[in-house]
Amino acid sequence: MKINPYLPDGVYVPDGEPHLFEGRVYLYGSHDRFGGETFCMNDYVCYSADPSDLGSWRCEGVIYRREQDPRGKEGYLYAPDCAKGPDGRYYLYYSVSDSSVISVAVCASPAGKFEYLGDVTAEDGHVFGTGEEDPYLFDPAVLVEGTDVYLYSGSCPYRRFKETQIAYLRNHYGKNLRLFSRQMKSTHSVVMRLRSDMLSMRGTAKPLVPGAFAENPGTFSGHEFFEASSIRKFGDTYYFIYSSKLCHELCWAASSRPDEGFVYGGLLVSNAGRYDEERGRYETYCGNNHGSILETGRQYYVFYHRQTNRSSFSRQGCIEKIRMESGRFLPASLSSTQGETEGAGEYPAYSACILQYDGNAGFSASRAAEGRENHPYITQDGPDGVPGQYIANFRQGAKAVWRSFDLSGIREIAVTIRGSGVVRVGSGYAETDSGGWREVPVPFYENEENEIVITGEYGNVDILKIALREGGTA
């Protein structure tokens, strides 16, 4: 059975970079902490899967700890990427938060454990990213073709800040204010060529795709680069994947060359879901996004992440099938099942791909900041590392949707809930008045939809799981 998020209950690994190494798919990402105060507070872990079964992932354990980096005590390990070098070893590229430095760790195995190797340096020997005229470096991506090594990075502002926001950012950045100022001046993502030592630059960094304040964004207008660089090559075409200035969407651009000539292609996926033009709203809670594309078994998959716990700092990875036609990717829709069609079985409530209140959602972090106590959210009772996620605060006006399912033959949906209230499940109702979890079966009548919808009718309940059953009471 395949569900989203694709990693186990209670695992928070966003910024996913999937790579096919030695016959398995290895997943590299940052590592959030449940209830964390900022991004990426935990050490890197790696998961791997058989390429024919992206529903079953094996934890390879901690592959790199922040104290292994000389700057690790001052920050956290942001989104990494990994590549097999010309020498057959595996190189992990990453950046410690608020450093503007790309660092490298190395290992003989894609599953770790990695050891610190050094920092990427310019031709004059200085650590690139530390110079006053250097671009702001962030979210590295790496491509190795024979002895040619390309490194991609960058972060561009997606808006101009108000004075009150600038005051906050000055306080946040403190001694790194100069670093923040460089970031605010960035107009493009950048690409660099590295020598075979995987550390030393060959030549200078080149601008690659435009950010929001580039003089001429060209084909990228409306979807300019924000962050989250990733790179893939399919056939003879290079695909640059990135998060746009809208934050919640992953986009792609294509070129016949790895270091220039990229033209905007389109949207891959938005963690905000579908956009309602008439109402001017997206359909689920959203936030920043970062991921990439995997090709396996003649099928393409887009990896991305979503937000939980009314926060930007407890993110989880998701997968969707994605189609390519004539070299162009078509946008993926959000699903609970990695784009597969599932049937009878038991599904955790946190696999809901749509969550909203009164037809409204928005950025996840702002829901808590604005004190919107009526909004539902995904959370857990235990501390970080302990499974047990569920949908909390499901009140009148709340809505959860699970896609994509084959509901032919399903005659009952049992919902496990607690609290005091009533929810509507399809055309039936489930009621509880209990402090503990209680399973309530609800008759289900076949419809033409491929989704399950639960809405809050009154009271306040939590939802742990749903079970789709053939036969039953209908």
Could you describe each region identified by the protein language model?
Residues 1-474:
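Carbohydrate-active catalytic/glycan-binding domains of CAZyme proteins
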